């Protein structure tokens, strides 16, 4: 037999062996946190597409074999197995990722998306194990919290050692799972969604950019495009935390913007914010609304959010309140909240929610 024929035969045998090994695994049931597009094409494995921050997946099983399947060269993840130290998975691409040295027995697994990807999406193809493994019960949390906001809610550059960051440094040091939202939710063993995007506001984005968009125009969709409206009958958060206004008011108006005065911007912001909360309330009648804002911009943000709360309460929506936070060091990228700041904000929210009666 010619050498190249032998090489081809061996390659074919190895490929067949690899395919056989892949076919011998089975997908595990999983629990999804965050907005995810679940697709089940004919004769194809289920896929889970995402773009919003802080999405997570969980599974549990009894066995000793675990492989994660990715199709994502955009995001950074952390993998937590049995509450052990997290393992960082950096832009895995299209790959099968085996978990090494897994002992026989019961295991709980959690995969968390860390990074912000405003213009791209990624796909997770699931957790896989060997046929002899036994799936175990998935989390069935009764508590749900939704966080809606901008870069402060995203955790923009929150783990950076410096305020000065390149785009790549910003990407690598943004850890949405260390932002105040997930920290707060985990303290209550609550499922959570982080529906936030850096630079966006209620009616105006940072320095007037992308005037045809706002966080309110992005919010209705499952992904960062208008192809799929988000609907999940099981998502009924008892608490909705909104932090929007920094981008609306942190810069002066430009000549080409549609508001000719600051007062016109204020009125538009308040009217649209009130309308947005009312829409959320119509779908979540029991939800407690917390409108958070900093003391920045000489109190302008706090004043306008206060008007929103007053109008909502005046219209009969009483389960709404304002929290103004101060005292942050803003040592993250580009003067954003640091991981230490995020913990302070989480502590503020945790204490506040612990004092609320009957919200769960």
From Swiss-Prot:
Give the range the annotation lists for the signal sequence. Answer: 1-21
Q: From the UniProt record, which GO molecular function terms apply?
A: acetylxylan esterase activity; hydrolase activity, acting on glycosyl bonds
EC number(s) on file: 3.1.1.-, 3.1.1.72
Please list the GO biological process terms of this entry. glucomannan catabolic process; xylan catabolic process
Tell where it localizes. Secreted
Which residues make up the annotated site Increases nucleophilicity of active site Ser? Answer: 336
Alphabetic keyword roster: Carbohydrate metabolism, Glycosidase, Hydrolase, Polysaccharide degradation, Secreted, Signal
| Main subcellular localisation | secreted
Q: In which pathway does it act?
A: Glycan degradation; xylan degradation
The site feature described as Transition state stabilizer is recorded at 199, 247
Q: Which reaction does it catalyse?
A: Deacetylation of xylans and xylo-oligosaccharides
UniProt KW Hydrolase keyword: yes
What cellular component terms from Gene Ontology apply here?
Answer: extracellular region
- The catalytic site is made up of 151 (nucleophile)
User: Cross-referenced Pfam families, in alphabetical order?
Assistant: CE2_N, Lipase_GDSL_2
> Enzyme group, top EC level?
hydrolase
Q: Which domain of life is it from?
A: Bacteria
Family (UniProt): Belongs to the carbohydrate esterase 2 (CE2) family.
What job does this protein perform?
Involved in the degradation of plant cell wall polysaccharides. Catalyzes the deacetylation of acetylated birchwood xylan and glucomannan, with a large preference for the latter, and of the synthetic substrate 4-nitrophenyl acetate (4-NPAc).
Q: What is this protein called?
A: Acetylxylan esterase / glucomannan deacetylase
Report the gene name: ce2C
């Amino acid at each position: 037999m010619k050498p190249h024929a032998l090489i081809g035969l061996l390659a074919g045998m190895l490929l067949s062996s690899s395919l056989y090994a892949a076919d011998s695994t089975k997908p595990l049931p999983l629990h999804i946190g965050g907005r995810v597009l679940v697709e089940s094409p004919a004769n194809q494995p289920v896929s889970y597409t995402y773009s919003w921050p802080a999405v997570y997946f969980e599974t549990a099983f009894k066995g000793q074999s675990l492989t994660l399947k990715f199709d994502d060269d955009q995001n950074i993840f952390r993998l937590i197995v049995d509450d052990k130290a997290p393992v960082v998975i950096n832009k895995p691409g299209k790959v099968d990722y085996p978990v090494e040295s897994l002992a026989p027995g019961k295991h709980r697994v959690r995969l968390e998306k860390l990074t912000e990807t405003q213009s791209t999406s990624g796909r997770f193809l699931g957790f896989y194990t060997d046929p002899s493994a036994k799936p175990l019960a998935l989390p069935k949390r009764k508590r749900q919290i939704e966080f809606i906001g901008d870069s402060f809610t995203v955790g923009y550059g929150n783990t950076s050692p410096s305020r000065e960051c390149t785009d790549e440094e910003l990407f690598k040091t943004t850890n949405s799972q260390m932002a105040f939202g997930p920290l707060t939710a985990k303290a209550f063993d609550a499922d959570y969604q982080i529906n936030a995007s850096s630079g966006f506001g209620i009616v105006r984005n940072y320095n007037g950019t992308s005037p045809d968009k706002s966080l309110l125009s992005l919010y209705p969709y499952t992904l960062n495009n208008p192809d799929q409206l988000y609907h999940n009958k099981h998502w009924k958060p008892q608490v909705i935390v909104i932090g929007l206004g920094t981008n609306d008011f942190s810069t002066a108006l430009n000549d080409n913007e549609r508001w000719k005065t600051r007062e016109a911007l204020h009125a538009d912001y308040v009217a649209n914010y009130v309308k947005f909360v009312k829409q959320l309330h119509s779908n979540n009648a029991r939800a407690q609304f917390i409108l958070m804002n900093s003391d920045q911009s000489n109190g302008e943000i706090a004043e306008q959010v206060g008007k929103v709360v007053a109008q909502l309460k005046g219209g009969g929506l009483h389960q709404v309140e304002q929290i103004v936070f101060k005292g942050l060091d803003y040592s993250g990228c580009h003067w954003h909240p640091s991981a230490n700041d995020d913990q302070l904000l989480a502590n503020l929210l945790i204490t506040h929610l612990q004092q609320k009666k009957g919200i769960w």
